[in-house]
Amino acid sequence: MSTGLQKGSRLMENRSPPSSFSIEHILGLDKKMDVASSPIIKHHRPWIECSSKVDGTFRQIPLIYDLPVQVDAMRRSAEEETKIRLDRGEEERLTYKREQSWYRGRRPRTAFTRGQIEILENVFRVNSYPGIDVREELASKLALDEDRIQIWFQNRRAKLKRSHRESQFLIVKDSLSSKIEE
């Protein structure tokens, strides 16, 4: 054996234990851990986790954001992942549509009854900018949240503005078309 190889082999034998800053230590490769008992870090990303109904039962689409603490835990088979997902309780599952709505930051639409709309329209004719006290009174009488009433008035004012703009456009259009015909 050459002297260079002998020195290299002696250096490897005298090697100190890996430091706590080594890649192996940081990734946890220096520790042997059972894959089944390895904890999983699960980030809260409900817009990725979607349920789909197949054969009358809900099956979850496999997630890609389950990050194991130990790199060895990444070797779980697809069957194990599917089994874990199917074992979850029904209460944890949401429909695809609801999850997508949540992702967009929307709340479910408020369905106003005819009676509620009539009362809101009557108040709007009198005052299109009701104060907080009027909105709170309406909320208690109509069994709605005050913020829903505030949004209704905002939407109604936008509708009025839009219809006014459209009527102004039609007036201008009619006057221009009559001048062109002359």
Swiss-Prot record:
DNA-binding region: 103-163
Keyword Nucleus set for record: yes
Biological process according to GO: pituitary gland development; regulation of transcription by RNA polymerase II
Keywords for this protein: Developmental protein, DNA-binding, Homeobox, Nucleus
Gene Ontology terms: cellular component: nucleus
Tissue distribution: Initially expressed in the anterior dorsal region of early embryos and later exclusively in the primordium of the anterior pituitary gland.
Disulfide linkage: none
Entry keyword annotation includes RNA-binding: no
GO terms of molecular function: DNA-binding transcription repressor activity, RNA polymerase II-specific; RNA polymerase II cis-regulatory region sequence-specific DNA binding
Upregulation: By Ammonium chloride.
Known role: Appears to be involved in the regional specification of the anterior head of Xenopus embryos.
PANTHER family given in the database record: HOMEOBOX EXPRESSED IN ES CELLS 1
Family: Belongs to the ANF homeobox family.
Protein name stated in the entry: Homeobox expressed in ES cells 1-A
Organism: Xenopus laevis (African clawed frog)
Gene name in the database record: hesx1-a
